[in-house]
Regions:
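Residue(s) in the substrate-gating loop at a strand-loop-helix junction
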Residues: 135
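Conserved glycine-rich cofactor-binding loop
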Residues: 10-11
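Conserved glycine-rich Rossmann-like NAD(P)H-binding loop of the short-chain dehydrogenase/reductase
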Residues: 24-42
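Conserved NAD(P)H cofactor-binding loop of Rossmann-fold oxidoreductase domains
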Residues: 85-90
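Substrate-binding pocket helix/loop in short-chain dehydrogenase/reductase
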Residues: 93-94, 101-104
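C-terminal helical subdomain
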Residues: 175, 196-233
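Active-site helix of classical SDR
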Residues: 117, 151
Length: 251
């Protein structure tokens, strides 16, 4: 059985990945993992000619991650696509962020994709792909989103390392670096209307971002940064000392 796995699939970018995954990969089933079962069922019903399996799970919970991993190890599917999309981000001064929110960001943004990817790799054949959703926040430190940008820098490093490590096996790894999108992420994280930087940035289209990431991953590419302005920022962050970048990246 050939499958794809998408986390954070209930809305936004994850939903777009789910809607387009079958166009780029030969899949028998798509496994959807997210907290909201009703939203995933609605998504599955919008694709009546496709087979979707729903895993209601909160990736902040290690037991939920283990449930998904157990399904992989029990059924031993051929995993053609893994999209580590689920993520959390909160905006505030570092000492004001609730401890539980910091823990949640670390668990969802780092622990979950690390453990899920490690479990999936043994079942990925040549030609399979892993997509990690990072962020433009990975390019330079973001004051007032210190933990979030650190988790995304971790994902950037993990994706680059695994791309090199898995290349001999023919498994491609791509990191996607989107800028802010008009999704629930901005409201859930208390970002919308509270950040002079985010409020001024152009918005990334989730549909186009997912399509480009899937297409580039299928072609063996290693990264995608939507929008020309964000590509320039990525270059700027590479060549400019971060103490000069941070006044621009401060959220």
């Amino acid at each position: 059985m050939k499958i794809g796995i998408i986390t954070g699939a209930s809305s936004g970018l994850g939903r777009e990945f789910a809607l387009q995954a079958f166009e780029y990969y030969d899949l028998d089933e798509l496994w959807l993992a997210a907290r909201r079962e009703d939203a995933m069922r609605a998504l599955a019903e919008s694709m009546p000619d496709k087979v979707c399996r729903i895993f209601p799970c909160d990736l902040r919970d290690l037991a939920a991650i283990d449930t998904l991993i157990a399904a992989i190890e029990t059924e031993k599917p051929e995993i053609r696509l893994l999209v580590n999309n689920a993520g959390l981000g909160y905006l505030d001064d570092f000492e004001k962020v609730d401890r539980d929110k910091d823990i949640a960001m670390c668990d969802v943004n780092m622990r979950a994709p690390t453990l899920l990817t490690a479990a999936a790799i043994p079942y990925m054949p040549r030609g399979a792909a892993i997509i990690f959703v990072s962020s433009i926040a990975a390019f330079a430190p973001n004051p007032r989103m210190s933990v979030y940008c650190s988790t995304k820098a971790y994902i950037q490093s993990l994706a680059k390392s695994l791309r090199y490590e898995l290349a001999p096996r023919g498994v491609n790894v791509l990191a996607l670096y989107p800028c802010p999108m008009n999704t629930e992420f901005l409201t859930v994280g208390g970002i919308e209307g509270r950040s002079r930087t985010f409020d001024k940035l152009p918005r990334c289209d989730p549909h186009k971002a997912a399509r480009a990431a899937l297409a580039r991953a299928a072609k063996g590419k290693g990264s995608h940064t939507p929008l020309l302005l964000m590509k320039f920022y990525r270059f700027l962050a590479k060549v400019t000392p971060h103490n000069l970048i941070m006044p621009l990246s401060k959220t």
